[in-house]
Amino acid sequence: VHVSCEQSHEAIRRARQKGMRVFGEPLIQFLTLDDSEYLNKDWEYAARRVMSPPFRDKIHQDGLWAGLQAGSLQVVATDHAAFTTDQKKMGVDNFTLIPNGTGGLEERMSVLWTKGVETGRLTRNEFVAATSTNIAKILNVYPRKGSLVEGADADIVVWDPKISKTISVASHKSVLDYNVFEGFQVNAQPRY
């Protein structure tokens, strides 16, 4: 379940305490962007950020980070739905026709590392759990995936926290003509 607000997180936490098999995944966008993005006077800028659920008030972010730390939220996703600006314009006269979703797949790991690990919101182990181990467990492919043990698939990334870059539409690999993380300075990139 995509989790964008503290009320959803709390419902998931209570359900898990009762033994229900339910999982929560805040999107990297929900951890780092907020509903002020929709107040931009440039219609295209705001429309590019339309997704479901929407960005929420910044007040919800601390609770989502805490959920990742505590394990009541399990993974960080992106809901990568690469709708271009022209596609988003389908809703120029009717908000309900704006295709929901935005990019984020390419940026997820670096933004999570920079805004999570480097700020002390997540440990390195919590980062690995939220990006690899937990999803493998949820999908019942652990320990073949999501672990470094003998006999497991060798799906690894060499992560270098010393490689920095500024996120930009000019250099990203996505087909999108915008990037919701435009201008973010991030540290840590896959080396291999």
Predicted ranges, named:
Residues 48, 75-76, 82-161:
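His/Asp/Glu-enriched, well-ordered alpha-helical/loop segment
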Residues 19-21, 70-75, 136, 145, ...:
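Active-site lining segments that contact anionic ligands and/or coordinate catalytic metals
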Residues 9, 32, 84-86, 167:
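Glycine/Thr-rich phosphate-binding loops of Rossmann-like dinucleotide-binding domains
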Residues 5, 29, 81-83, 161-164:
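Short, glycine-/Ser/Thr-/acidic-enriched flexible segments
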Residues 48-59, 98-104, 178-188:
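A short acidic, glycine-rich active-site loop
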Residues 1-76:
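Histidine/acidic residue-rich metal-binding segments in metalloenzymes
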